[in-house]
Amino acid sequence: MFIKVLGSAAGGGFPQWNCNCANCQGLRDGTIQAAPRTQSSIIVSDNGKEWVLCNASPDISQQIAHTPELNKAGVLRGTHIGGIILTDSQIDHTTGLLSLREGCPHQVWCTPEVHEDLSTGFPVFTMLRHWNGGLVHHPIAPQQPFTVDACPDLQFTAVPIASNAPPYSPYRDRPLPGHNVALFIENRRNGQTLFYAPGLGEPDETLLPWLQKADCLLIDGTVWQDDELQAAGVGRNTGRDMGHLALGDEHGMMALLASLPAKRKILIHINNTNPILNKQSPQRQALTQQGIEVSWDGMAITLQDTAC
């Protein structure tokens, strides 16, 4: 299995365009050791030629321009994106669909709950019908494996996770199980597995078996502490309000990852306020000591027979 991180930041990217928090200003003036990041999305493949896009960030055009694997040479117009899977209906995971309109029709897999949000509150499915048929919806059901024709050796399973519906959704603060899913992806040729969850609130007993059998975790690293936005003076929401489990809290993401056997544990969807963006921060060093990696834009991951 081949995985490439197109974008590793949370909504707004890093630096965020209107933010002068310590991280954003530090990156701009060169006083911290950090790198710019676009908003969260990845591609996966069973052969390194045809790819499935998992979430379409607002930065998708820039991300594709920096990903030669997706350029389909020899045709006037084309792409090696053979399908799109959405894990939720959040703005930072779906706005990029609008930028892909010239390539419609696109085959899009998502739950009925996500499709409802994207047909009403943020109606991209409706808007894009005028572009060569727009987005073709393939419903996915929780814990029911499915495949995408472009990558037939990859089996995807949507796993419901505790998070939140987007602010525009009528289900905000009362999400249904299909509003947020992780993806458990298995290469049926060699059995290697990836668990992808860019947004994860509170893990429960039903989620743990999926986490425990994954060879590689690509998982929510949004905030270091639950009140991070408040402490930085840039917002009122807590990590929990937004549907994200804080890394450094007593029973947070680091503690969860320490209990799991995955060969690699990699963080994605990192907010601009998170101190782990600074490679020299104590928080980043704490991750390194526990063998937890921080993804970056363009990071390539290969899952082979014996290791990932």
Swiss-Prot record:
Keywords: PQQ biosynthesis, Transport. The keyword Transport applies. Gene3D superfamilies: Ribonuclease Z/Hydroxyacylglutathione hydrolase-like. One of its GO terms (biological process) is pyrroloquinoline quinone biosynthetic process. The keyword Transport applies. HAMAP family: PQQ_syn_PqqB. This is Coenzyme PQQ synthesis protein B. It comes from Klebsiella pneumoniae. The lineage of its organism: Bacteria, Pseudomonadati, Pseudomonadota, Gammaproteobacteria, Enterobacterales.
